[in-house]
């Protein structure tokens, strides 16, 4: 469910970027930057849990995937920056 939600949020933002431009789609882009990496981390974490101790060993790529995805959450700014941007975009719609 969460994976499909991330996929559809991404597709919605892509359509908006193509039709009205990146500036107007900025809120959707910021939402993706928060939501998609968090969903990926949850999925990887579940896979690690299913594999037990082997999930964090060198015998599976899961520990490395988790580390890479966790780093990605910081690459374009921490989640808090993007959450603040979403709040500003959304509140800006009602402030005149």
PLM feature spans:
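Alpha-helical interface subdomain recognition
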Residues: 1-96
